[in-house]
Amino acid sequence: MKTKFILLLMISAMCIWAGDRSPAPTTGAGSRAWTPRKTDRPVYSKLTFVPGFAGCSFYFPAADGKAIEVAFREAGRGEYKDVLTPSYNRREKLWRGSIVNLKENTSYEVKISSEGKVVAEGKFITKGALPKIAKTIVLSEKNFKDGTLTITAKGKPDGWIRYTCAPGFVLKNDRTKPLIVINKAKYIVLDKLVLNGGGHIAVEVNYASNIRITNCDLSGWGRPDAKQYFDYVLGGKPGYIDANGKQRSTNYSAGIALNYGDNILIEKCYIHDPAGHANSWRYSHPAGPCAIFAVCPTSTTVRYNDLVANDLGRWNDAVEGLYNFGEDGGFNRDAEIYGNFMIFCQDDNIELDGGQQNVRCFGNRFESSYCGVSIQGCMSGPCYVFGNMFISMGDQYGYHGQNIKTSTNGSGVDAVAYVLNNSFTGPGTGFSMNRLLKAVVMNNAYDTSYVSGAKVMKYQNSVSDYNVMPKVKEAVPGKNGKLVAPGYANAKQGVLEPKADSPLVKAGKVIPNFTPEKDVNIGAFQKGTILPLRPMPVKTSVNKLNFKVANKKSAPQSFKVKVCGKNYSSPFAVTKSATCDWFDVVPASGVFESGKEIEFTVTLKPELMDKKTVYRGAFLLRQPDGLSRPVSIYADTDFVQKARLHNDGNKTIYINAEDFISGDGKVEVINDKNADGGKAVRLYEAKKGGKPFVYEFTVPADGKYHLMLRSRSGHRPRVRVSMDGGKMYDSALALMNYWAWATAMDGSAKKTSNPWSWKVGYFTLKAGKHKLNIMPYGFKDIDLIALTSDPGPFEPR
C-alpha cells in the first residue's frame, strides 16, 4: 500500500503546475483567445449577501477582526439557527462565509453577533427557477442558416428572451466556429436546444449577465480526432494535426465556455461525446475537451447536469477553469455546483482551482476520473466540498490520483477549504493535507483511500476528525475518527448508503447548517439522501453494474427503480452514447409513477467487445425536463492485447525478457498463457551492490527510441534503467493488473516547470549495438522489452 501510495503521489505531483501555467488556446480557426483581465474585486462596506438557488454567500467587514457568530432563519418563521463560523481575511478585513441547504425563491433573515451583542442584521431572497418570458424565438432551418447564432439582445428582469428550437431541429455546423455566441447579452434563456457540432467551443458566453442554459443537448464540438498526436510527437504542445498539416490545440475545447459574466445558470443539460479526446497522464499533462469551461464568472450555478464523455473519448476535466492560481480564477466567487453527474475524465472531474471564494460543490456524483475534485490553488476561499459521492475512480487506463486534489502549495494566505460528509469508494489517494492551505476535513467516509499529511496539519491549524477510513500507517481519521471499514450497503455496485450496523450511522459531528441537528451519519448519505441531488423522487437500486465476458458470453443483469413521493409522474427514456452500442437496456422507455417499481435488464453484446480488456459506459434514465438518474456499466473481458504491435524492425526492436546476458538478481520463470509465447520472467532486485540485468540489442538506424516494458502489476511499480553504461535513473511504471505495455521514461530527460512540455522520455541512439541495464525495485514480471520510435500503438487495451 505504501509503495503504491508513493507512486500515485509521484504522478499526482505532476498535476500541480496545470493551472495558471497552462497555455491558453491560440487564435485561429477552431481556437478562442482568452484575454487575461483583472476583474474588479468588490469592496464590502456593510453586511452583503449574494444569494444562489440553494445557498447564499455573505460578507461582513470588521476592521478589528473580533470573532462573530452568524445565525439565520426563514423570514418570520421559527428560531434562528447557527451558521458554520465564517473565515476572516486579514488583508480585506472581511468575514466571508456561506449559508447552505436553503429553499429556492425564499426570504431569509440573518443576524450577526459579537461578544454577545447583535452587530448587524439583514435579509435576502434566494434565486427562483422560473423567470418571466417576454419573447420566444424558435430556431429552425429558416432562421439558423449561417452555422452560428450570435445573441446580443438584452431582455429585462421581468421579461426574458427565450431561444428554443423547432421539434426535431438540430443546430449543426462544419465545426469551424461556435454554434452560439452570447456577447454582452442580458436576461437570455437557451431552452431545449439540441446542438451537434461547433468549433473549438459549441456555446460561448462572453461578458454576459443573467443567462440560463437549461435542458440542452450538446455533442460533437471540436475537431474530429482522426489522428491525435500527443506530447512525444508535438514536442510539448498537445494537440493534433489537421487536414492541412497544421497543429491545432485540443485544450479548453468546451461545450459551454463562460468568459467572465455574472449570474449564469447551466442546468439539466446533457453534454456528451465531443469530437476530440484528451490524452492520459501516460504522455503528459492531459489536454483535450471539457464540458464546461469557467473563466472568472461570478455568481454561477451549475446543477442537475449529466456531463458524460466516453471511455475512448474522455474529457480532460469535465468542468475546467482558467487562471487556477489567480484569486479571481476558475469559478471566481459565489458559485454553486450541485446535483451533477460527471464521468470519464483523464484528469479531474471538476477543477475548482482559482478564487474559490464562497464556491460550494455538493450533492454530486463523481466517477471514472484520474482525480475527483481539484481544490489546489484556493487563492481566496472559503470553498466548500460536501455531501458528494466518488466511485470507480481512474482514467482510461485505470491510473488514479487524489480523490480531492491539493497537490500544490499555492494557496491564499487566509483561504480555508471545508471537506465535509463525502463518501468515497474504490481507488485513489483520498485527501492530502497541504502545508499552505487550511483544511477542515470532517465526517468523511473512505473504504480504500484516506486522509494523510499529519505532519503538515500544524502549519495552518488544519483539522481532520470524525472520519472513517482504512487502517494504514499514513491515515489521519482524527481523535473521534475510526480506522475501520465504512460498512457501505453495496460498494461494488456504487451504493454507498450505510448498512444498519455500519460505523457511519449516527457517528458524525453536528456541523451547523451543513448536517442534521442530531443523529448525523458520517459520509454523504443522511436519511433519505439520493445522489446526485436532484428534485425527482426516483431511486435506482444500484449506481453501477459490473460484468464479466468470457468466451463471448455474459449473463444479463437486472436492477430496480423505485419511485417515491406523491403524485409524481414523468415519462423517461434510456439515453446513452452511440459508443455504448455494446449493451442494451430494457425497457427503453416508460413512465415513472409514485409508488411503482420498474425492473430494468442490461444485456451485453459480446460480439462487439473484442477490442479491449475493460469496457466502460453509462446510460441515463432521462425525463423530458432534463432530469435523470444515471447508471454506469463496467465489463471485464478475456481480450488479450497482441504483444508485438509493430512488425517493422526499423520502428521497433523487441527483446525477450529472459534474454539478459548478465545480472545478479534472482530470476523465476512464469508460465502464463497471456504472456508473449506463454512465458515471462520475474526479475528480482539484486542485493546491495549487485549488478543490474543487462540486455544487448542492435538499432538499425539513428533515432529517438522510447523504452517500453510489457509487464503487469507487481511489487513496487518502478525500475531503474540506464543505457550504454550511463547513470541509472528511476522510472515509474503505470502498470495494469493484466499484461500491458508501460512506458519507462529516460529519467535523465530534463523536466521544466511547465507540464505541457513534459513528454514520454526517449533515448537518442546511433545505429549499431547497445546495452540496456534494468534493475527492478522488489521484483517485476516482464515478458517483453521494446525500443520503439512510435509508442502510440503500445497504449493498453
Which residues fall in each region the model found?
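Extracellular beta-strand/beta-solenoid scaffold signature
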Residues: K145-T148, D174-I180, G197-E204, K227-L258, ...
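Parallel beta-helix/beta-solenoid
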Residues: A153, P157-D158, A166, I180, ...
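C-terminal accessory segments
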Residues: P477-L533
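Right-handed parallel beta-helix/beta-spiral solenoid domain characteristic of secreted/periplasmic
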Residues: P131-K145, I151, K156-H200, R212-Q247, ...
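Extracytoplasmic
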Residues: S554, K576-V586, V591-V602, D610-D625, ...
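Beta-sheet-dominated interaction scaffolds and their linkers
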Residues: R534-G565, T637
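Predominantly extracellular beta-rich ligand-binding scaffolds that present long acidic/polar faces
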Residues: R360, F366, C383-V495
